[in-house]
Amino acid sequence: MSPGLAELALAIAEAVPDLKILLTSGEAFGPFASMEAAVAAEPAEAPGDETEGAYMFYSSGTTGQPKGILRPLTGQPFNTPLRIEAMMAARFQFDDTSIYYSPAPLYHAAPLAWSIGTQMLGGTVIVTDGFDAEATLAHIERYRVTNAQFVPTHFVRMLQLPKAVRAKYDLSSLRLVVHAAAPCSIDVKEMMLDWLGPVIYEYYGFSEGGGFTIVGPEEWVARKGTVGRSITGPIHVVDDAGKELPRGEVGHVMFETQERFEYHKDPGKTAEFFGPRGWSRPGDRGWMDEHGYLFLADRSSSMIISGGVNIYPQEAEAVLTLHPAIRDVAVIGVPDKEFGEAVKAVVELMPGTVADDTLAGELIDYRFVPAEVPVYWNKP
């Protein structure tokens, strides 16, 4: 724990008394011992029976509290590359020359895993203490970043910069920009490709593992909106009863997998995740085309049913995100006596923007088809 987070560290130590090893990267304080001193006290020789461990990440908690993901140990020799490192090297061209930029919080599984993986492969990691759009461009230029990982919100914030600001920075060192974790609208992806060129890759996966798709820039341009094809095993799209659906129909996305894990101290959730067939069910809805490319509709838990019509919030969010008055947006379903559910958009406006009925009307009219028009508005 960094000394700069001393107050938070002490609160965590008090709240979780079962923590046995408490280390700080600076001078010792409270119950936290110096990491340097602890390392210096260890034998210089490696233990004779040391084997490789496994990451234990936590789920994102979209349907409740984050859950620990406990993987079986392989017993392989220490420093044997784990699957994430092998995949980064084979699929995303990471090696000992990579300079990886990670602006997202390390309590998320992907930024932490990819940062560790880069170092295991001999590369360099640049971690920031927050995201700022222009600072990101300055960092890429300063550190000659080769690989970076973003979420679509980062893309939007960078695209909102004036073109003159974006043009100030030399981004030519970028070999690969990867994004995941949330839906990226077609318009945003097209603008990023126009700006940075064919270096943008997308993947779809989940903290639990058991399913992973990848799509490169050329593939995506040919099938706009896809998150790619599986590299781990067959994908199935099924209805609520578990029946396989034809290509092109929206249903629950499931992956055939031999990979196993346990939710920490939660066998019931573990059984629910794999279901009776033993397939991974990440909780997303989507469809596949005739070539096996997966397209996502939304989280199953996010779908809004209004007057018998299925409405996917991410479609409305993708449109509203591009409006120049909006900084961020979330679209949700709210109870409605007539339709069962109505659509509600909660928007964060750009600084200096006036929230009034004129703007609300403008946003409702902004590139929507009737079934997607949000009917309630909250304006902070």
What are these regions (language model features)?
Residues 77-99, 103, 107-147, 161:
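Conserved AMP-binding/adenylation subdomain of ANL enzymes
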Residues 67-70, 79-90, 100, 137-139, ...:
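Adenylate-forming
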Residues 36-37, 55-57, 61, 120-121, ...:
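Gly/Ser/Thr-rich phosphate-binding loop
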Residues 10-57, 76-85, 161-164:
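ANL superfamily adenylate-forming
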Residues 23-29, 201-208, 227-228, 332-335:
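Beta-strand->loop->alpha-helix junctions that form or flank phosphate-binding loops
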Residues 42-52, 56-101, 123, 168:
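Conserved adenylate-forming
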Residues 1-7, 67-70, 124-130, 201:
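Short beta-strand->loop structural element characteristic of the AMP-binding/adenylate-forming
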Residues 1-3, 138-140, 148, 241-244, ...:
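AMP-binding/adenylate-forming catalytic core of the ANL superfamily
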